[in-house]
Amino acid sequence: MAETTLFRNVRVFDGENEVPSEETDVLVRGSTIEGVGPAADGDTTVDGGGRVPMPGPIDAHWRSMINSLPAEAFLGAEIGYINHLAAREAERTLMRGSTTVRDAGGPSSGLKRAIDEGIVAGPRIYPCGAMISQSSGHGDFRMPHEVPRTPMSPLSRVMQVGAARIADGAEGGSARHPRATDARRR
């Protein structure tokens, strides 16, 4: 059974009244509020001092890998180093109060697993995977010399570290738009 935490002397905002309640107790088991009102005991007791507890906010546009260092450094850094910085940023994000994040693009599944297994501290992560972006869009981190020129060109750094995109913008012509290639060449 999950441990309990008893928050004593807290005021609860219930969403129905305009002001928080008088001081009361909130019992939490694991990560679930089990009860509000006078409670006998918990495995851990925290005196709220009349404050209003709130669940941790959700950051719906967070990037585990990119938030950890400036873009210029990110583009040239070794992936193992980036992973360590991302773990540090995850802990900082949690300490700022966000208990859940939606990763908005990048290879965050390994970091999510490390957090879920208790290896590193961080918020609950809902990973996105690769960013979908058109060529030269905000999710295209390729340097000009990395753009493949032939089918056998070496993989770009973005592809090597597993952050490749799923889709790309219009490339060449098609039966419906045969002049797309001509427009690109102008």
Predicted features by range, described:
Residues 2-3, 12, 16-55:
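Histidine-rich, glycine-flanked metal-binding segment
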Residues 10, 26, 31, 50, ...:
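Divalent metal-coordination and catalytic microenvironments
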Residues 40-43, 114, 155:
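Metallo-beta-lactamase
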Residues 42, 98, 122-124:
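A generic structural signal for alpha->beta connector loops
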Residues 46, 102-103, 127:
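General beta-strand structural signal in soluble alpha/beta enzymes
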Residues 51-117, 135-142:
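Metal-associated gating/positioning segment near the N- to mid-region
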Residues 119-186:
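Metal-coordinating catalytic core of metallo-dependent amide/deamination hydrolases
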